[in-house]
Amino acid sequence: MIVREPRVVSPYRALLAAVPVREDVVRVAGSETHVWTYEPPGGEEARVTVVAVHGFRGDHHGLEPVVAHLTGVRVVMPDLPGFGESTPLDGEHSVAAYAAWLTELVAALGLGPDVVVLGHSFGSIVASAAVAGGLRASRLVLVNPIAAPALSGPRGVLTQLAVAYYKAGAALPEAAGQSVLRNAGVVRITSLAMVKTHDRELRRWIHDQHDSYFSRFADRRVVLDAFRASVSSDVSTYAADVGVPTLLVAADRDDITALPAQHVLQGLFPDARLVVVEGVGHLIHYEKPREAAAAIEEFLA
């Protein structure tokens, strides 16, 4: 795993610095899973606990800006197995395997049925699959949910290029494949394709976040497994079986899932609310964390 420390100071650093956090390690499904628990600042008592699942190729750092804007909420945030600090699962890294891991993790942490499950991007698929499959939770929150197959999104051609890129990474010898899959130029192109803000400093920070954390996967097998999982399933597969109130926090400029698909997805859940954040794409957690946190707090009130 390549480790590159961030070089650009977070615009949310002051808020995040006030949040007490601890790191624990729990062995789940063969993975030494690293888990960060963020408590409300100032000794405030948490009124609810949220377990948050980050997106593809990310780690727990990605959702920290949202955490920093929440009040009265305890957030428990693991690195997905095979990404960040967590070691891989024993077997394949499929949606089903990740959902089973999440269910087991929640039980291992002793979190009861009042827990709220949150997922961003690929994490929205994992979270939905877990809750639909029996993870006991009181509510479900999906940020930038993958509402439809990625190949059918507004920029499906980019997904097709990504498929070709990962196929190339799989076909090459191990060392060469690893190099291709961690290529800094490709990471930057991906970041440029997703960012929407015109704020130069915020853009610099977002690119630095991707440069720092987007290649912290354990090995080629893990990232290829997870990519196949991310493009072979979506939240709509599981929506009808989610029996708890659900919040969809979508973006009007998301290139992965078009807004009309989010409205369709809302109708597939037995009980779902849709909040649309304007002027942002697939990076709500980086560009509009305050708005995301406000929607989440209103939903949990």
Q: Where are each of the predicted segments found?
A:
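Short beta-strand/loop motif that positions the catalytic acidic residue
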Residues: 242, 248-250
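Flexible "cap/lid" loop of the alpha/beta hydrolase fold
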Residues: 139-174
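Short glycine-enriched nucleophile-adjacent loop
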Residues: 124-135, 140
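Conserved alpha/beta-hydrolase catalytic His-Asp/Glu region
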Residues: 175-240
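Conserved acidic catalytic loop of the alpha/beta-hydrolase fold
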Residues: 97-115
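Conserved HGGG/HGGXW glycine-rich cap/lid loop of the alpha/beta-hydrolase fold
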Residues: 34-85
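Catalytic histidine-centered segment of alpha/beta-hydrolase-like enzymes
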Residues: 280-293
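Acidic catalytic loop of the alpha/beta-hydrolase fold
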Residues: 253-257
